[in-house]
């Protein structure tokens, strides 16, 4: 697929592991590849990301992408948070009905902005709802996923990953 779309000459692209997600209407579809199915794809995508000639910020982007594909591969293989997840701290989601989720994979409401006058702060700062319980669950590694959006936030807040990316960029 990647090579078939090369004629479009995109400056950049990203792929993401298909997952069952409430907001995408894919629950029960069994679309997530097995670790064995995804591993060679992740290796291929990482190698392509590292081989792309790039300068400036694009070098960092490609280095983070190469790291993301390997992280996603490990999450699928190990079925655990390979690096700590920051969902509910670094990111959150508001569903169309006003439910606040720490993460769209779990899609578990921790509050509803309709009940707080559309003010996120009481929910986010744990004055109402159960954001504290969700954060505790996530920190306790009770979940794991390879979702790109969450993974990039997690990688940016994970010192060893940032150091690896920096080393790849400087060492290239």
Language-model segments: residues:
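Flexible mid-to-C-terminal extensions adjoining Fe-S/redox cofactors in radical SAM and related proteins
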Residues: 80-82, 99-172
């Amino acid at each position: 697929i990647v090579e078939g779309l090369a004629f479009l000459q995109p400056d950049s692209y990203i792929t993401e592991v298909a997952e069952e997600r409430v907001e995408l209407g894919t629950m029960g579809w069994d679309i997530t590849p097995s670790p064995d199915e995804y591993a060679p794809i992740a290796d291929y995508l990482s190698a392509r990301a590292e081989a792309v000639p790039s300068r400036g910020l694009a070098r960092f982007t490609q280095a983070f992408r190469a790291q993301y594909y390997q992280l996603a591969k490990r999450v699928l293989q190990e079925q655990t948070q390979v690096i700590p997840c920051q969902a509910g701290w670094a990111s959150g989601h508001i569903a169309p009905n006003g439910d606040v989720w720490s993460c769209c994979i779990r899609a578990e409401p921790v509050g509803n902005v309709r009940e707080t006058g559309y003010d996120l702060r009481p929910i986010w700062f744990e004055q109402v709802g159960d954001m504290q319980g969700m954060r505790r669950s996530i920190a306790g590694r009770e979940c794991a996923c390879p979702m790109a959006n969450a993974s990039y936030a997690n990688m940016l807040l994970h010192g060893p990953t940032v150091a690896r990316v920096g080393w790849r960029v400087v060492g290239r």
